[in-house]
Amino acid sequence: MWDPLVHEFPETVHGFRCMLANKYLLAVESKYAPDTLGYELIRDCIGVVRSRNYEQATSRYRDIYTRLQGATEAELQQSVQERCCCPHCPRHKKADMGESAHVQKAHDVQAVQKP
């Protein structure tokens, strides 16, 4: 088990609570498969706890809370059908497949000689 006394200790009570919440969420995360809704929600909660910006964390927590309120325990264990494509989630980014679809490729034009 992780020992908080051996590792760097937070300076504030809030930091200590966040550290404990983070460790607890990491332990709960192992209960869910990586492709389930429960896993995504736990990872999002970890992101909220680790966030240093209060307004951003509050906004993200509201989103998580809304998603969690409508989910049953069985739904948390089910595989996620839609993948999240939000820009702030590195775990959802796919490998770059080359060029973007909206970028046109430049074509070489032969030199035109003047008459």
Curated annotation (Swiss-Prot):
The keyword Plastid does not apply. Pfam families: Gemini_V2, WCCH. It is found in: Host cytoplasm, Host perinuclear region. Disulfide bonds: none annotated. This is Protein V2. One of its GO terms (cellular component) is host cell perinuclear region of cytoplasm. Belongs to the geminiviridae protein AV2/V2 family. The lineage of its organism: Viruses, Monodnaviria, Shotokuvirae, Cressdnaviricota, Repensiviricetes. The keyword Transmembrane does not apply. Keywords: Host cytoplasm, Host-virus interaction, Inhibition of host innate immune response by virus, Suppressor of RNA silencing, Viral immunoevasion. It comes from Tomato leaf curl virus (strain Australia) (ToLCV). Through its interaction with host SGS3, acts as a suppressor of RNA-mediated gene silencing, also known as post-transcriptional gene silencing (PTGS), a mechanism of plant viral defense that limits the accumulation of viral RNAs. Interacts with host SGS3. GO terms for biological process: negative regulation of gene silencing by regulatory ncRNA; symbiont-mediated suppression of host innate immune response.
